[in-house]
């Protein structure tokens, strides 16, 4: 062993001599380095820096670990090595040794507080696989104040860095511990998922394997390792003895290695490339530093090459290490080669040296510019509003603006987390001692994605693009004064000193800027891995949860003492060519025009400065032109969901390619027909076939009529069939079969009986046409007129004086060519009437003269229900917007009618967008910019006001129409009702959003359309007060029944059309005494007819257009109304009398009593649904209630349900549908049960039920199903309030009204659901009245009100004047006649009154009075 020690000592001495010679030669030509303030040298005991160097050649054996027990088996070797290292340290006085740096740290106490572990930076695993020629020296401060970082977290951080960084010379002042915590567990799963992407790096050499950092935290593990180290030491010593015998060859190799190691040390000294070692307080961190240094300085070679390993001794206990403060490091080999300094041989020795020289030359400014001209680096610059995200797994890019909330999980940010964890760990770094240079290699051309060379195969590897985002840098000075951008973007250098005055920011966009200070103590990582929270001080709390994508913090002032995170965007002033990795080069705006963002549920809308945007406030300001969404914003903010994109792409690929990946080329479809194809007309049914069908229907009806009333009827009828039923027998009964004989007259075909002679008959009765055919012919003449020209879409010449000015050129009709011929005469007249009231004239050249005229204002279109008021209004709006495109029309209607308006716009192919504010669904015609902003939010995060504001904004910014219901308009724009009682006033908190919407809805509409304008007729209601305060005076009121209950309500409706006329109308009513029509007055008097009505008509004439519905009478088959007075059975009469007694006692709640009577008149069992008073219980006892409960499903216990069941059965035979109305829900539910029980029908198929609780879409679905002639629907049960207005139920030809209401307009509206344009059958209506109940007098009052309405609203249409008001009455009703004549059903009927509301029949209503 003494021999071994002598040989080692001699070889070491020779090695030192060679080192000194080389040092003197290289100090002659020093390399210029960045200016740095040298610390004062302080004497130090160099014995504390002694390192044990044990040469070994066995790769499989880990380096020995030095401990207190080391001197037992090998004391001589230890003493030899100690003397050698003491001599070595004496000779190293000329260079900046680690001990000097250690002493320097003592002089600078800030250094110790800022230092942290190398393992926190992740140097080991970040650079281990492919980093070559990195010489690292690590000075160690004695003490560190930052502690308590677990080995697991440090190890995880070291595994996160990119393994493909080549030729990195790193100068970092390393603290002893990191303040970064709780990061490893959140991002450990990313270790093996994706390969990091570093652009512009050329890797030429393989690197050693992974280095595992050992920890001394467990004493048992340390003891085992020390024991194994002792054993292996002797084995290595024996190998050394054998290697000595090899002679001078091995000596020469050792000399070369010594020279090379000395060169690397000198280079590190000259280039100021050092890495400070860890403090002894953290053994794991110390191991991490040593392994990182060795790994970065190692280079690859062949398997058969020999290696000389420099193994550093093990550290001791923590207390001893604190005293010694020596840079003791301990490494261990794991799976691959140990930490060594590799000997280079052959060609592999030249390239690393050349690279070192190249790095040294880059420190010169002039040479750097030349080098930069040779190597063109593509730098990606992006604005903060268009940030590029790259998936850490697949490399796919996306752009967008994420939110800054701490709970936000940003997609595609995993790679950012991997890189930024290390950067945030540097918040407490003291200073950068030297520069960091990255050799990025050369790139050819201008590829959108850089390529990395594979060190093994030499081939180029396509790596995903580095996300081109603005990443802040690390500044760790005491007083950060200035930040400058370097000239060369591809070779960033960072200069730092004890007091840094100038920091040059590197161009690498992947380094976040973190300003830290001495007192920065803790950086906490929240549970969500993508957004680290920073809790450093009270002032730094505002910085928490800031994202890395552009949110800026206040600038760092001089003398900053708190840790602040900033993400300011660094402008790039370099003249390098711009290239974004997604294919857009030299023009970053191209990318901006195709921004696509994932629709994340928690994303917030950010503006160009990456600040959160208040969508509602932005749209409100845009409406009032305080701010505006421009075209650029519209293009930038359009959103395309990632799922939608992937699905669309998958569908597109499926269409283009087959299973084998080949392109599918489909031939174009063959054209079977050429030219313009006309739509197929329905098959023409001959008269013979139609007559045959009619005969079969009559046969079926006769057969079914024999079955009604029970099964015994058919047997009785069969017995009575005999010779008495022959035609002769019928003639004897007076039932003749008449026909027209032109020579005789109207005579019987069988017996020759002449009922009327030919001379007494009118010529019109000779025709062969029936009444229906005659109406069809008249309608054809009226609609088509002269006109073949009308079929071609041109207006037929009209010689009428009244129409002369209309058809002339220069009128509003020219704005809608071809539409006039499609309108009915009353619609054409109404169209011009609206123009004259709102615009003053129909002549285009005179419109400007009436813009501010007092003659213009609102108008009322009082057309009969079903005569096409909606169609007329749509045509007017279409023409009005052509002349006044800045007009903002608003349509206010009941909620159930808004869908009808939308359907009408589609039906007539109107291109004007219609925005339904009462619906939260979008039509696709909204403003793309506003809709794009809203779609960035998840559906659950969108408020109703934001959705409504998008529609309002779309309505304001384009030529469109806004629709809203009365209830919603009252909610959004309503004013507080001060007249109501205190208990009715709701205290509502001030809502800024509602105030903004109210201001828009009250001030911006230029035209107001009120459908069913009789709805807001109460002067004390909130909706009436709100509508009367709308700024615009251009209003159109649509109502088929403007007169509802009294003249006061009529005056309120007229006042909405012309607010200026309200006082005049009120005074007229007071003078004429027409207020007597209020409820409770019995006598109307003749004064109203003679004086008051005429005065009121004179006031209304200029702005009220009336059409009584003559177009319906001339175009539709006909209408037959009948009041059916029924006799209730015994049980029902008993219950009705009990309630009637209470009613006669003048109970206070009259409406509650009327409700009971209406329910019991339908079925007596419904009394259980009502609240029975104590007096009523005297008559309606428990026994009666139990009996009623048993007969609940028996329709024969009520006269109305019995009539309805038999009636529906007969209508089913003749294939006619029945529409049943009631003002209450309970009767309709009971009738549905009766129908289902008797006919075995299914609810929703044969029986449809509509009530007020249904949504608008469900209502429209039921309507369409019932009107479909091919559907199974037989009966439609409807609530009077739910569907008595606006909707079309032309599928029904039989209408039954179960109860009587006070308002005559309600019944008229209900009847008009079936009797309207589009009806193809005669409509029969039945008003069911129970005898002996208050329903008779109520109906009389209703008839009187209807008569007054007829007198007030006289026909004002030119087309109606001179024509008969009432068309030919329909006298035949075979269904009702059959029921009345039936022997078992005749007892139900008490009386029938046909056409009861005619003027000559009003006085005859006394028959209905009890």
UniProtKB/Swiss-Prot annotation:
Record-listed E.C. numbers: 3.6.4.-
Segments of skewed composition (Polar residues): 95-108, 428-446
InterPro entries to which the protein is assigned, alphabetical: CLSY/DRD1 (IPR044567), Helicase_ATP-bd (IPR014001), Helicase_C-like (IPR001650), P-loop_NTPase (IPR027417), SNF2-like_sf (IPR038718), SNF2/RAD54-like_C (IPR049730), SNF2_N (IPR000330)
Low complexity: bias regions: 276-301, 576-587
Motif placement: Nuclear localization signal 2: 328-335
Cross-referenced SMART domains: DEXDc, HELICc
Composition skew (Acidic residues), residue ranges: 245-266
Chain segments annotated as coiled-coil in the UniProt record: 248-278, 356-377
GO MF annotation: an example: helicase activity
Cell location: Nucleus
Chain positions of motif Nuclear localization signal 3: 1132-1139
Role of this protein: Probable chromatin remodeling factor.
UniProt similarity note: Belongs to the SNF2/RAD54 helicase family.
Name of the protein this chain belongs to: SNF2 domain-containing protein CLASSY 3
Source species of the chain: Arabidopsis thaliana
Gene behind the chain: CLSY3
């Amino acid at each position: 062993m003494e021999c071994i020690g002598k040989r080692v000592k001699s070889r070491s001495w020779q090695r030192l001599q060679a080192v000194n010679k080389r040092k003197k030669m290289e100090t002659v030509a020093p390399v210029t380095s960045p200016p740095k303030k040298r610390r004062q040298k302080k004497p130090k005991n160099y014995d504390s820096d002694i390192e044990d160097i044990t040469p070994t050649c066995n790769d499989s054996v880990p380096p020995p670990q030095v401990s207190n027990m080391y001197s037992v088996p090998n004391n001589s070797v230890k003493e030899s090595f100690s003397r050698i290292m003491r001599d070595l340290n004496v000779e190293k006085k000329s260079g900046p040794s680690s001990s000097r740096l250690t002493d320097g740290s003592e002089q600078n106490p800030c250094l110790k507080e800022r230092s942290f572990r190398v393992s926190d930076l992740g140097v080991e695993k970040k650079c281990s696989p492919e980093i070559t020629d990195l010489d690292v020296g690590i000075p160690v401060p004695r003490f560190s104040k930052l502690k308590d970082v677990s080995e697991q977290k440090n190890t995880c951080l070291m595994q996160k860095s990119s393994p493909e960084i080549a030729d990195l010379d790193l100068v970092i002042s390393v603290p002893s511990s990191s303040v970064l915590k709780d990061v490893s567990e959140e991002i450990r799963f990313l270790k093996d998922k994706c390969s990091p992407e570093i652009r512009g790096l050329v890797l030429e050499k393989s690197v050693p394997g992974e280095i595992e950092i050992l920890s001394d935290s467990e004493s048992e593990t340390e003891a085992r390792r020390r024991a194994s180290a002792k054993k292996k030491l002797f084995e290595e010593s024996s190998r050394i003895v054998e290697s000595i015998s090899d002679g001078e060859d091995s000596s020469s190799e050792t000399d070369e290695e010594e020279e090379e190691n000395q060169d690397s040390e000198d280079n590190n000294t000259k280039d100021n490339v050092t890495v400070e070692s860890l403090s002894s307080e953290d053994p794991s961190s110390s191991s991490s530093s040593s392994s990182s240094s060795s790994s970065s300085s190692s280079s690859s070679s062949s398997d058969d090459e020999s290696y000389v390993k420099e193994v550093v001794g093990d550290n001791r206990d923590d207390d001893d290490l604190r005293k010694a403060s020596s840079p003791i490091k301990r490494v261990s080999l794991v799976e691959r080669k140990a930490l060594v300094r590799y000997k280079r041989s052959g060609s592999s020795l030249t390239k690393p040296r050349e690279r070192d020289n190249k790095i040294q030359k880059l420190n010169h400014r002039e040479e750097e510019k030349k080098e930069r001209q040779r190597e063109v680096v593509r730098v990606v610059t992006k604005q903060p509003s268009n940030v590029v995200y790259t998936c850490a797994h697949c490399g796919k890019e996306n752009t967008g603006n994420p939110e800054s909330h701490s709970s936000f999980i940003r997609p595609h940010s995993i790679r950012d987390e991997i890189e930024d964890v290390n950067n945030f760990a540097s918040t407490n770094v003291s200073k950068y001692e030297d520069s960091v240079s990255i050799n990025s290699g050369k790139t050819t051309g201008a590829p959108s994605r850089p390529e990395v060379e594979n060190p093994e195969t030499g081939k180029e590897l396509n790596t995903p693009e580095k996300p081109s985002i603005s990443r802040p840098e690390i500044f760790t000075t005491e007083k950060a004064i200035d930040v400058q951008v370097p000239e060369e973007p591809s070779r960033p250098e960072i200069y730092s000193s004890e007091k840094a005055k100038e920091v040059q920011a590197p161009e690498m966009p992947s380094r976040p800027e973190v300003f830290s200070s001495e007192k920065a103590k803790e950086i906490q990582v929240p549970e969500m891995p993508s957004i680290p929270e920073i809790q450093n001080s009270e002032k730094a709390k505002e910085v928490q949860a800031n994202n890395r994508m552009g949110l800026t913090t206040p600038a760092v002032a001089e003398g900053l003492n708190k840790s602040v995170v900033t993400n300011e965007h660094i402008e790039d002033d370099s003249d390098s060519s711009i290239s974004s990795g997604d294919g857009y080069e030299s023009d970053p705006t191209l990318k901006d025009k195709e921004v696509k963002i994932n629709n994340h549920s928690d994303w917030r809308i950010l503006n160009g400065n990456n600040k959160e945007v208040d969508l509602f406030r932005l749209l409100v300001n845009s409406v009032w032109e305080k701010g505006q969404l421009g075209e650029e914003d519209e293009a930038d903010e359009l959103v395309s969901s990632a799922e939608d994109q992937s699905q669309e792409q998958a569908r597109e690929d499926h269409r283009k390619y087959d299973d084998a990946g080949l392109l599918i080329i489909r031939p174009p479809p063959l054209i079977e027909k050429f030219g313009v194809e006309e739509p197929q007309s329905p098959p023409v049914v001959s008269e013979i076939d139609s007559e045959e069908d009619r005969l079969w229907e009559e046969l079926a009806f006769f057969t079914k009529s024999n079955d009604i009333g029970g099964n015994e009827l058919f047997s009785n009828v069969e017995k009575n069939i005999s010779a008495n039923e022959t035609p002769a027998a019928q003639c004897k009964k007076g039932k003749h079969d008449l026909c027209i004989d032109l020579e005789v007259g109207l005579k019987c075909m069988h017996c020759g009986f002449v009922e009327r002679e030919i001379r007494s008959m009118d010529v019109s009765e000779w025709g062969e046409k029936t009444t229906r055919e005659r109406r069809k012919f008249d309608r054809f003449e009226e609609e088509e007129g002269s006109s073949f020209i009308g079929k071609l879409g041109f207006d037929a010449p009209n010689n009428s004086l009244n129409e002369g000015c209309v058809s002339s050129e220069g009128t509003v009709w020219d704005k809608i060519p071809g539409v006039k011929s499609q309108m009915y005469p009353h619609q054409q007249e109404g169209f011009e009437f609206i123009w004259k009231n709102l615009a003053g004239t129909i002549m285009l050249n005179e419109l400007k003269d009436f813009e501010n005229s007092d003659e213009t204002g609102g108008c009322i279109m009082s057309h009969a229900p079903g005569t096409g008021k909606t169609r007329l209004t749509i045509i007017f709006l279409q023409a009005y917007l052509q002349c006044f495109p800045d007009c903002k029309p608003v349509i206010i209607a009941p909620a159930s009618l808004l869908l009808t308006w939308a359907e009408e716009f589609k039906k007539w192919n109107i291109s004007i967008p219609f925005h339904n504010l009462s619906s939260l669904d979008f039509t696709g015609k909204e403003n793309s910019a506003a809709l794009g902003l809203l779609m960035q939010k998840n559906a659950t995060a969108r408020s109703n006001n934001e959705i409504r504001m998008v529609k309002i904004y779309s309505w304001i910014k384009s030529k469109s129409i806004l629709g809203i219901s009365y209830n919603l308009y009252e909610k959004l724009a309503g004013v507080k009702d001060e007249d109501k009682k205190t208990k009715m006033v709701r205290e509502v908190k001030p809502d800024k959003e509602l105030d903004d919407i109210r201001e828009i809805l009250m001030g911006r509409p230029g035209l107001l359309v009120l459908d069913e304008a009789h709805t807001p007729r109460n002067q004390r209601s909130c909706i009436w007060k709100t509508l009367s305060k709308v700024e615009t005076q251009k209003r159109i009121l649509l109502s088929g029944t403007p007169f509802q209950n009294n003249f006061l309500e009529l005056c309120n409706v007229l006042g909405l059309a012309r607010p200026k006329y309200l006082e005049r109308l009120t005074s007229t009513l007071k003078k004429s005494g027409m207020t007597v029509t209020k409820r409770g007055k019995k006598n109307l008097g003749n004064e109203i007819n003679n004086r008051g009505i005429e005065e009121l008509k004179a006031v209304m004439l200029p702005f009220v257009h009336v059409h009584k519905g003559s177009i319906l009478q001339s175009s539709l088959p006909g209408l037959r109304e009948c009041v059916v007075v029924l006799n209730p059975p015994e049980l029902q009469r008993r219950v009705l009398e009990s309630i009637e007694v209470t009613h006669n006692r003048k109970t206070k709640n009259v409406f509650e009593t009327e409700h009971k009577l209406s329910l019991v008149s339908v079925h007596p069992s419904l009394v259980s649904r009502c609240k029975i008073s104590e007096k009523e219980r005297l008559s309606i006892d428990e026994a009666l209630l139990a009996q009623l409960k048993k007969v609940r499903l028996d329709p024969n216990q009520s006269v109305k349900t019995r009539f309805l069941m038999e009636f529906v059965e007969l209508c089913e035979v003749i294939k006619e549908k029945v529409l049943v109305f009631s003002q209450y829900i309970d009767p309709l539910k009971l009738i549905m049960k009766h129908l289902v029980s008797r006919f075995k029908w299914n609810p929703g198929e044969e029986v449809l039920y509509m009530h007020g609780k249904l949504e608008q879409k469900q209502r429209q679905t039921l309507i369409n199903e019932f009107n479909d002639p091919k559907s199974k629907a037989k009966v439609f049960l409807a609530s009077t309030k739910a569907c008595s207005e606006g909707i079309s139920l032309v599928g029904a030809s039989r209408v039954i009204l179960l109860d009587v209401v006070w308002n005559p307009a309600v019944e008229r509206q209900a009847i008009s659901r079936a009797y309207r344009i589009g009806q193809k059958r005669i409509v029969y209506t039945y008003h069911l009245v129970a005898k002996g109940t208050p329903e008779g007098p109520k109906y009389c009052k209703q008839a009187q009100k209807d008569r007054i309405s007829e007198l007030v609203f006289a026909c004002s249409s030119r087309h109606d004047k001179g024509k008969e008001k009432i068309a030919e009455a329909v006298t035949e009703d075979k269904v009702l006649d059959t029921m009345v004549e039936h022997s078992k059903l005749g007892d139900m009927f008490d009386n029938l009154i046909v056409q009861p509301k005619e003027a000559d029949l009003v006085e005859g209503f006394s028959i209905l009075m009890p």
